[in-house]
Every structure is written in structure tokens, then in C-alpha cells.
């Protein structure tokens, strides 16, 4: 009974964050918890922003380029018959859009620009989905929409007309003139400055398609039924340069997180060592009074674990509060054409918590035991 009271008294004294009699030691405790909080908060925010940034880029690329594309295998183009055949096989298992593209020269009143002209059917998924990128005007089946950067570069306004010259074998194959009825903005400069969108209802001649685009594709769907007749490209092949860039961008982020984790580790280890080293006399007195090593180690482990939990909990609350506010109210704006988004992207991911607590508690436990053994032999 006597030893239980001593254990409780020692536990209370050791886990106290602030003690008026030992202000410097108390400041060290507060500073240690603060460092744990800052490090954990930084890791959560960095990973959340990184995931949000990648998700934003992938979503834009998927909206514009699809999850997969179907190309002709034996012939130069796809037909309406191919479209009907594929949709009859897979029905509503994914969204499919028909694309007719033209590489052309677009002439304005000031200058000319090489552009990619993409046209689709007004009833296809792409036609409806692209509307979320429209910043002004509308997309109709008798007009075209252009990227925000292109319109800004040549000081064009909605209602202006553009002349299109389509070349084949260095000769003008066809020429068109259509009104600009809207502008879109994806925050990807190449698209917003060199892409024209329309429906293929603009063309009088019979349309053939370069490819079909698949969106909302589930990996459980098998394309074996059409694999032999058509070439099928995955998103990673369509957007290979972007995906390679995203992967290379990922490495510095991982390195930064690693260094922050190392700082957090050193902080926990250093705090435990400081406690044991400067309380060495008190520990020896407690041992001489009859307290056993196991009880003292348990108290040190509880203290270290408690400090780690307090720091991690504070960081988690602050981090997810910030993520919630940023995802709903867009507190931090960004230059769109630099970061491909107009606000700091964040991704809510609670799996970070599953890693943080076990890692912090394991570190606290091991550093407490190792430091205790180290100091006891000094």
C-alpha cells in the first residue's frame, strides 16, 4: 500500500507539465510538446496538400482525356457503327464520348495560332462534363468555346468570330468561321491556350472519329470483348508526361516529411534523456527507498507517451480544422497557372491518424526504455 502511494505520487510529479518550483524544466516540457505538435501538424498538412494537389491534377486530366481511350486497330478511323457496337456491349458500365479532332490554324484579327480543335457529340458525357470548366458564356452545338488564356492573349471577347484553316499535306483542306460563345479554364496552360472545343454538328460532311474516350471506368469492368478489334490506351499512357512529373514532384515531398519525422523523433528522445539525466539523483533516491526498476520504467513510459499523445492530439485537431476550413472556404488562394488550381488543394484523409499514434507511442516507449538504461549506467 505504501509503495502504491509512492508510485502515484511519483507518477503525478513526473507527468506534470508545469511545476512552479522548476520553471526551466517546465518550459522544456512545454517546448517538447509544442515541437511534437508543430511536426505532426506539418506532416498532416504537407501530405494532405500533396494528395489534394495530385488529385486535382488527375481529375482535370481525367475529365479532359478520360480514364481510357479506344483507337482503331485495323482502320484509320472509328465510325458511328463502332460506337453503337461498343455501347451495346457495355451499356451503362462506363461513360463514352466520340471525338473528332483537327489540327488547325486559328486566325484572329491580330494574329494566327496553331490549335487543336476537339469536337464531340452534344449528347455525349464530355459535352456535359466540360461545362464545369466554363468561366463565361455557354457551349452550344453551333459555336465554339476557347481557352481563357487564348482569349486573353489576343484580346478576344465572346461573340467574336474565329477563322479556322485545316491543313492536309501542306495544303488548306478546309476553312471555317465560327463564333466564340464561351471560355473555359482548366488552369493547365497548354489546354487553356491551344485548345478549341465544339460539337461536330458544325460540320456538314460525314464525321469519322479518331478515338472514343471512356470516363467513370471501374477496374472491375473487363474490356476483353473489344480488345482484339481496337487499341485501348490507359490514362497513364495518355498523360504519361504529367504522371512522370507528378511522381518526380512526389520525391522531394517525401524527403521533407522524412526530415520532419526525424526532428519529431529527436525531440521525444531528447526530452526523455533530459528528464532522466537531470532527475538522476531523485531516481537513485527513489530506488534506494525501495521502488523497483520496473515501476520507475513504467512511470517514465507513461509520461513520455502522455506528452506524445497531447502533442499529436493538438496537432490533429488543428490540422483537420484547417483542412475543413480550407476545403470549404478556400482561405488560401494560389496563382492558378502556377499551381494548376486557384486555391490551396487539401485532401481529407483520416488514415494519417492510424500511422501517427502508433508511431509516436512506439517511439516514446523505446526512447524511454533506452534512455533509462543509458542514464542508469552513466
Sequence positions of predicted segments:
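Peri-transmembrane interface segments
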Residues: 22-30, 222-278, 285-286, 299
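N-terminal Sec/SRP start-transfer signal
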Residues: 1-40
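Membrane-proximal extracellular/periplasmic loop immediately following the first transmembrane helix
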Residues: 6, 59-109, 114-121, 326
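Short beta-strand boundary microenvironments
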Residues: 115-153
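C-terminal membrane-exit region of the final transmembrane helix in multipass inner-membrane proteins
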Residues: 348-378
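Alpha-helical transmembrane segments
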Residues: 26-28, 38-65, 273
